[in-house]
Amino acid sequence: MSIKLINIGFGNIISANRLVAIVSPESAPIKRIIQEAKNRGMLIDATYGRRTRAVIITDSDHIILSAVQPETVANRLNSNKEILEDTLEEDEEEEEE
């Protein structure tokens, strides 16, 4: 199993294997989820002070805020041209040798 990483903006990278959902932060239920995660200490703000455009929910119940559009994150997830994935696979092959 190869590890696939996704760039969520400003040099921040997350594991695609842990991703559950990518949603827009506009709705009231998502705003509540963000606030609850903040209160529990499970919120990761990767916006660098910019406007939150995507909320990423992980299987570990962490909530990650990103300044990148949800569509962009999804496209990066579906892309077969991920440089990071290729790099990790090459590293794994070198370790096996």
From Swiss-Prot:
InterPro entries: RemA-like
Taxonomic superkingdom: Bacteria
PANTHER family (alphabetical): REGULATORY PROTEIN SSL2874-RELATED (PTHR38449:SF1), REGULATORY PROTEIN TM_1690-RELATED (PTHR38449)
NCBIfam families in UniProt: MtxBflmRegRemA (NF046064), PRK04323.1 (NF003315)
Protein family (similarity comment): Belongs to the RemA family.
Listed name of the protein: Putative regulatory protein Teth39_1325
Organism of this sequence: Thermoanaerobacter pseudethanolicus (strain ATCC 33223 / 39E)
